[in-house]
Amino acid sequence: GTKRGEKTMKITGMHCENCVASVTRAINRIDGAAAKVSLKKGEAVVSYDREISNEELKKVVEDRGYHVVSIQ
């Protein structure tokens, strides 16, 4: 669909490319969301084509064992 917007999530606990892949998969599993995760910056930029709540984004990442510091 059309991109509605994007959010940047600051995430701690990612240490390697496996962590990046895990976070990417977790976010991409949300319908309408696509993530670009940077290990170096410790963040995920999430593009979405429907409204996705910060709570939903936070939950899927924290369920994998990472900590979400902020979403904006």
Language-model-detected regions and their locations in the chain:
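Flexible metal-binding regulatory segments at protein termini and peripheral loops
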Residues: G1-Q72
